[in-house]
Amino acid sequence: MIEADNLNVTSIITDYNPIVDYRPKKLVDYIGQTNVREQMKIFIQAAKMRGDALDHVLLFGPPGLGKTTLANIIANEMEGSLRSTSGPVLEKAGDLAAILTNLEPHDVLFIDEIHRLSPVIEEILYPAMEDYKLDIIIGEGPAARSIKIQIPPFTLVGATTRIGSITSPLRDRFGIVQRLEFYPTKDLQNIISRSAANLSLSITDGGLSEIAKRARGTPRIALRLLRRVRDFAEVRAAGKITNNVAMNALNMLNVDTAGFNFMDRQLLLVIINKFLGGPVGLDNLAAAIGEERETIEDVLEPFLIQQGFLQRTPRGRIATAEAYRHFSLKQSRDI
């Protein structure tokens, strides 16, 4: 139940503000994630033909793959507004109620890190997601009474890097569940090319390829690297990004040919050198490299595992033969 006096939306919701934002606004402009894009196109078109709100959508996968961008696209395609918040910000039932009661029909509510919602907030979400209703408490003590408030039909888009941490009752209320995968190099080249054009940058195919290869399959990283390579090119190469310029800039940034940064290399080399290739438990590994276990699980490991440099086993993490080859090291034993 929600106390009516606690409905204050100001500090917990932000209208989407596309200031100097070149991210795609429509599905037709969305690069990559072909299966997700085609499925969402059908689901959105069907909902619009019926005049309904789109079913609630759960997006999961490693960080930086476009979950927020896709939420904005859904709002645009449904001709509604996007309201954004995150799981940790929603601390009280009144926080969520304030957001929901300010929505318009077919608006999209985007909750990032939805796996971090408190049980109290989840309980409020259930009737809102299923019946578009809220339970509100009016008054106090013996005179208090509960009323149900109808809210407009809306779409909840939840994003998470840890789908296993979402409770089953919440997960089961999402009609559409989509996993975002790491991007192939070609798709990243197209994303970088479009961003470079928007920024009026001069970049060759070789420059595009070099940045894309080192971007860990992640658009967010690709665009961050593009901005840093742009800085390097403006200072040392008259603003033109060629293969050699991109290579020199990325080497200076300590991003190697596999896309590894300092932390990636440290993680693998600690397993190889200190733990003889593994297996090593997550807690020991976190202590050895001075990182939180959540950072290792959510940020570092997914790409290393997907690319075949690291294995998770019941006994712990193991550096693969591919990791040894990358560092030109000899395995002390078979893996």
From Swiss-Prot:
Superkingdom in the source lineage: Bacteria
Domain-related comment: Has 3 domains, the large (RuvB-L) and small ATPase (RuvB-S) domains and the C-terminal head (RuvB-H) domain. The head domain binds DNA, while the ATPase domains jointly bind ATP, ADP or are empty depending on the state of the subunit in the translocation cycle. During a single DNA translocation step the structure of each domain remains the same, but their relative positions change.
Enzyme Commission identifier(s): 3.6.4.-
Region feature Small ATPAse domain (RuvB-S), mapped onto this chain: 184-254
Family per similarity comment: Belongs to the RuvB family.
Listed GO MF terms: ATP binding; ATP hydrolysis activity; four-way junction DNA binding; four-way junction helicase activity
Full protein name: Holliday junction branch migration complex subunit RuvB
Residues given in the record as ATP binding sites: R23, G64, K67, T68, T69, E130, D131, Y132, R173, Y183, R220
